[in-house]
Amino acid sequence: MNYSPGLVSLILLLLGRTRGDSVTQMEGPVTLSEEAFLTINCTYTATGYPSLFWYVQYPGEGLQLLLKATKADDKGSNKGFEATYRKETTSFHLEKGSVQVSDSAVYFCALS
């Protein structure tokens, strides 16, 4: 897979679980300029208080945990990415202030 300098390709997928609990990512593939601000939206439907996760899969590599939050208002952060567990809006949006070509990957929102 070739990447043009200055562009970041993000392919967005989703993971969920059974029993009616689910996560939703509305965006499809996204291409951004380097140093652009990134937001990947993730909303969920669940009973109780699930643990929320962002996973990343870089080209040619396996799935890796990027960050997690286990209770409302927890903020996960790693490698410049952040996401805050918002129970009131049932969201766990992934953000990064300045993306790089090295951020090109597939990003998965999940709950447990």
UniProtKB/Swiss-Prot annotation:
<keyword id="KW-1003">Cell membrane</keyword>
<comment type="subunit">
    <text>Alpha-beta TR is a heterodimer composed of an alpha and beta chain; disulfide-linked. The alpha-beta TR is associated with the transmembrane signaling CD3 coreceptor proteins to form the TR-CD3 (TcR or TCR). The assembly of alpha-beta TR heterodimers with CD3 occurs in the endoplasmic reticulum where a single alpha-beta TR heterodimer associates with one CD3D-CD3E heterodimer, one CD3G-CD3E heterodimer and one CD247 homodimer forming a stable octameric structure. CD3D-CD3E and CD3G-CD3E heterodimers preferentially associate with TR alpha and TR beta chains, respectively.</text>
</comment>
<keyword id="KW-0675">Receptor</keyword>
<feature type="glycosylation site" description="N-linked (GlcNAc...) asparagine">
    <location>
        <position position="41"/>
    </location>
</feature>
<keyword id="KW-0472">Membrane</keyword>
<feature type="domain" description="Ig-like">
    <location>
        <begin position="21"/>
        <end position="112"/>
    </location>
</feature>
<keyword id="KW-0732">Signal</keyword>
<keyword id="KW-1015">Disulfide bond</keyword>
<keyword id="KW-0393">Immunoglobulin domain</keyword>
<protein>
    <recommendedName>
        <fullName>T cell receptor alpha variable 9-2</fullName>
    </recommendedName>
</protein>
<keyword id="KW-1279">T cell receptor</keyword>
<keyword id="KW-1064">Adaptive immunity</keyword>
<keyword id="KW-0325">Glycoprotein</keyword>
<dbReference type="InterPro" id="IPR013106">
    <property type="entry name" value="Ig_V-set"/>
</dbReference>
<feature type="disulfide bond">
    <location>
        <begin position="42"/>
        <end position="109"/>
    </location>
</feature>
<keyword id="KW-0391">Immunity</keyword>
<dbReference type="InterPro" id="IPR013783">
    <property type="entry name" value="Ig-like_fold"/>
</dbReference>
<dbReference type="GO" id="GO:0042101">
    <property type="term" value="C:T cell receptor complex"/>
</dbReference>
<dbReference type="GO" id="GO:0002250">
    <property type="term" value="P:adaptive immune response"/>
</dbReference>
<dbReference type="InterPro" id="IPR051287">
    <property type="entry name" value="TCR_variable_region"/>
</dbReference>
<comment type="function">
    <text>V region of the variable domain of T cell receptor (TR) alpha chain that participates in the antigen recognition. Alpha-beta T cell receptors are antigen specific receptors which are essential to the immune response and are present on the cell surface of T lymphocytes. Recognize peptide-major histocompatibility (MH) (pMH) complexes that are displayed by antigen presenting cells (APC), a prerequisite for efficient T cell adaptive immunity against pathogens.</text>
</comment>
<feature type="signal peptide">
    <location>
        <begin position="1"/>
        <end position="20"/>
    </location>
</feature>
<dbReference type="InterPro" id="IPR036179">
    <property type="entry name" value="Ig-like_dom_sf"/>
</dbReference>
<dbReference type="InterPro" id="IPR007110">
    <property type="entry name" value="Ig-like_dom"/>
</dbReference>
<dbReference type="Pfam" id="PF07686">
    <property type="entry name" value="V-set"/>
</dbReference>
